A protein has these predicted regions:
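A structural detector for beta-sheet-dominated domains
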Residues: 95, 160-162, 170
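Hydrophobic pocket/interface hotspot
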Residues: 7, 18-20, 61, 84, ...
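Short solvent-exposed beta->alpha transition segments
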Residues: 16-65, 69-77
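SH3-family beta-barrel domains
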Residues: 146-166
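SH3/SH3-like (including bacterial SH3b) beta-barrel domains
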Residues: 169-181
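Core segments of small alpha/beta cavity-forming domains
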Residues: 1-43, 105-153
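Second-shell loop/turn segments in exported
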Residues: 5-9, 70, 175
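Exposed beta-sheet edge and beta->alpha loop/turn motif
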Residues: 56-140, 149, 180-181
Length: 181
């Protein structure tokens, strides 16, 4: 829980130094993207779903959330993932650039029926909210933002978590809790 909160607080605050302590690597282009980010005002209503990672000490974290663009009132839903692993000292860290094996594993998790249900419901809500705000829709189109909230997960989009991260056996709020981040 502390790892995820610190990570997203650092992203929100554009605190590159803190991010370097929480992820396994952060290259100069990532640093620049973080410090120059100006479009998203914030994230809220974060719900985190966790699936077992490739090892006993790793996790695939799916996070559904609402995000607000600067200058617009509409909250758009989105979803993304993080791959979390454990250091030798037992502390958790976020894998900034998952390797091919990890990406393949994440792709397998994206095919899970419950994850698909989460992606589909998020996409339907995104489409509905965007259709109700013509100005925001036009703005996002001008920015080159495609209309797929659900696919942000497949592309590894980053988010801000402002709540606890429960690790669950399955990608469902009702699944057995097996820990917290």
């Amino acid at each position: 829980n502390a790892l995820i909160e610190k990570y997203y607080a650092a992203l929100t605050g554009k605190d590159v130094q803190s991010l370097k302590e929480l992820v396994d690597e952060l290259d100069p282009s990532d640093e620049s993207a973080i410090t120059n980010s100006q479009y998203i005002e914030g994230y809220s209503n974060v719900q985190v779903y966790t699936k077992k990672g490739m090892t006993d000490t790793s996790y695939v974290v799916f996070a559904a959330y609402d995000h607000k663009y600067v200058g617009y009132d509409t909250l758009l839903p989105g979803i993304s993932y993080l791959y979390v692993d454990t250091k030798e000292d037992g502390s958790l860290y976020i894998v900034a650039d998952p390797n091919e094996e990890q990406l393949a594993y994440i792709s397998e998790q994206l095919e899970d029926a419950k994850v698909q249900e989460l992606l589909n419901s998020t996409q339907a809500s995104y489409d509905e909210k965007l259709a109700s705000d013509e100005a925001l829709s036009k703005y996002l189109s001008e920015l080159g933002v495609e209309g797929s909230a659900a696919m942000e997960a497949a592309e590894g989009a980053q988010i801000t978590v402002k709540s606890n991260c429960n690790i669950r056996k399955e990608a469902s709020q009702d699944a057995e809790s097996i820990g917290k981040l």
